[in-house]
Amino acid sequence: CHSRGGPPGVWAVGGGGGHSVIQTFGSGVIEPGELQTTLGTGGILAAALDTAQENPKGRLQVFCNVAADKWHCMGVSLNAGSAMNWFRENFCHIADGQHLSFEQIVAKATASTAGAKGLLFLPYLYGERCPHADPKARGALIGLTARHDCGDVARSVMEGVVHALADMYSLMQPLGIEKHVIKASGGGAKSTLWRQIQADVFGCEVVTTDGAAEGAAFGAALVAGLAMGVWPDAQSAIKNFRAISREQPNLAVAEVYAQAHEMYRSLYPVLGQTLTALSSPIFDQ
């Protein structure tokens, strides 16, 4: 970054981090109790730590943060927006190669109910990375009946992605990571329904902030500002972030999602061996 107003020929070099670290910083997450979610092609759950933590099984990643004396912890799913795109391309045809728009699909999902009328979706369409490091993992719809329609399945896909994020959080809790607020980003954060599902499953407020839509690019701009002395530290850089949306947990559906999440968490341990067997080349002939 060239520092305008600085000595000629002097360049400021900003030390940042990988894509997720920068995106988390761009969402304003550096304090305890804050979680950051990214719903892009994959799904990310991230938080800041005051101290480095051991991660013996390697299912989470812990490394340096943008903020001084902070650490970054995250879990990454391979399936988020990619799962919705799979559903759209394969089951939402209209005519002449056209598909329902994502907005139309979400409208149908909104018309369904919390818990998708008793339908659960394991979103492991591309294998999985966290919380189950299993390249042979496969997706599944559990509880499908003749009464379920397009909107119910769409909602179960959206809920399954959020259940996967909440599954990651169960790995973070032993590290002392709390959840008071989620700061959402990524294309999926544009969906009011997807933000509300996060609030309901996690049981905490979900906000989006100005700049989060630009993701890592916005975070990189903040890092550049730090390098050029626009702000003295990371905390100062994010203190004026403005919330542009807020979703509160709906207590009326809290029990529905609590039970659904427990059922969701029970599925992979039971189905994992079968899903692995189904990845055998014999079924690809």
Q: In which residue ranges do the predicted regions lie?
A:
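Active-site core segments that coordinate phosphate-bearing ligands/cofactors
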Residues: 2-285
